């Protein structure tokens, strides 16, 4: 069996009503990064913490790109949970 080590980071996305792409720098040094996006309401107010589905790409070893189909409004925030894996 292989032991897997993990490192975590949490980043908040704040909508502005126009941007659909968000580059999130993690500096983990790898593309082996798990990404989960949670509904965080309006800076936590009214947050459901439900998983939100969006496209995620890993352009390089330092960041991930989250791409929403529709731009989040200025009153909608998301909490992005990032986990680095080392195999």
Segments (PLM) and residue ranges:
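Extracellular attachment/recognition segments
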Residues: 1-87
């Amino acid at each position: 069996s292989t032991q897997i080590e993990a490192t975590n980071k949490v980043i908040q996305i704040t909508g502005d009503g126009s941007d659909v792409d968000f580059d999130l720098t993690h500096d983990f040094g790898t593309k082996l990064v798990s990404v989960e996006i949670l509904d965080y309401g309006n800076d936590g107010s009214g947050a459901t913490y439900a998983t939100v589905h969006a496209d995620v790409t890993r352009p390089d070893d330092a960041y991930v790109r989250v791409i929403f189909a529709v731009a989040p409004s200025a009153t909608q925030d998301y909490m992005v949970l990032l986990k680095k894996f080392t195999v």
